[in-house]
């Protein structure tokens, strides 16, 4: 595996939409909730985190600009390890690297074979069409300052620009909650992106806990730095890809945007000392800075990952917004408010908020309202997650190799049916898992979308 270029650099805010800084209460309130918090190695399918990880004795750092630390980033033009850093690169965190206790044994399971490829999936008629290139306006016209009217919008990416990917696989070798298939998942997704979608190896950053380069170890600091790299310099029609396979869990929600009262988290290799990474932070880093028309595709193969990227539009297998998780009326009204915030139009923002019906405002104690106000985006962000927020995700064996069930199902579904719409792909992924696992993969988006158009990345 190569990591020839890691521009790194700080996170650049490109116009917030309803952005609000995270609350100051960053101290963790004990370990994550107890149910279903881990999984053990195969052969029988197991769930991520059947047992909770040890209590984390740490205090979350005080929030800095945009809710993440920017320490460690320095301007440089020199070689470090086996890759180059460009102007705006970062220096890896100080301290001894995590010791790997094993050697990498190959790219993991063999991708599905023997099944003839078809033009389209069995769900729906005919091949889906590509997404439209023009901006997609929807919802009511809003009156802004100066008497100008505006309408909320988003823009699909054509995925014809720069392609970058970040693949993270953490097996937690030597720990009481060790996994078997996550490193395989990261390498298989990397291979799939190169062969199927034309990504270049030099534009894919790999973080796995068998890496020998300390900057490729999936510590909390390295994961956050790589997330910043992924979105730095993003432009319309770029295609960015984020894949995470490892432990996931939940922690009490501190800012009131979760209707179940819990934020979703992922666990870096050094979570016992450095802490987990919360969905709010992942959204702030990887979604908020993206311009309209830039694609980010995320895959979370972990427990409790249904809304791990905090995208407010969750879709059913029929291709419609789920109820009561997201009401279209609330989504439209609060996206309007967010777009007014983006334009600096506080009057339009308030008008958009007030336009939401009382029935919607009273549901879920305001959590849905806050999420839609602050988490909608004109960028083209899609997340595929291995299960609902309340479910666990399996670490198992497929084709004789250890793997995460979601990572395998995603590759298998697109190998069998390369030309699929979003709703077709959601159904074929679920078909891959049906009868073997209880988990139900989820599709969520940063904007209301037509799920019958072609999935591209």
Curated annotation (Swiss-Prot):
SUPFAM superfamilies: Caspase-like. The active site is at residues 247, 303. It is an enzyme of class 3 (hydrolase). It comes from Cryptococcus neoformans var. neoformans serotype D (strain JEC21 / ATCC MYA-565) (Filobasidiella neoformans). Pfam families: Peptidase_C14 (PF00656). Involved in cell death (apoptosis). One of its GO terms (biological process) is proteolysis. This is Metacaspase-1. Residues 57-83 have a biased composition (Low complexity).
